[in-house]
Amino acid sequence: IILQNKSFMSLVYALYLTEQFFTKPDRDIIERYLVPSYFENDFSALDDGLYIQKEIWGREGRNIQVVQKRGNQAELYMEKFVDNYDDIVCRDSKKVMYQDFIKQKHFTHTVDSGTKEGCLTLSCFMLGDQASAVGCRFSPEEIAGTEAYFVPLLVD
């Protein structure tokens, strides 16, 4: 349940920034693969720019916003609207976290209804300290939600 809480990414990133908790090889991995992530209380100290705002217990793109930070204010830049909002099983979230907004590359992918352009999201699943699986979702939208397709991967 800890890993389902998105603020876990903020914790890992905050510990990474201290340069005291993780080894150098661990920090290199975090720097390469973890999008800079921040606790809600740290938002005012961040540089102006675009950030993703996520509820810490959010799922399937529910309640995700892209916000433009200017000073201590956050203006809505883009919002994710999901189909069947009330059918998405997730805990109620009163807290949010932030991540740097990274513009994604677009890909063309063939799905059951034809060819679509969209974005890929890669995920790694862990069992203990071992990577156990890799997953990929394709979405015609930049923020993947319930419309995303699971994409088979081949390791050759």
Task: List the predicted regions and their residue ranges.
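Phosphate-binding site of ATP-dependent enzymes
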Residues: Y38-I52, W57-E60, V66-D156
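Conserved N-proximal alpha/beta basic substrate-recognition cap immediately N-terminal to
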Residues: I1-D42
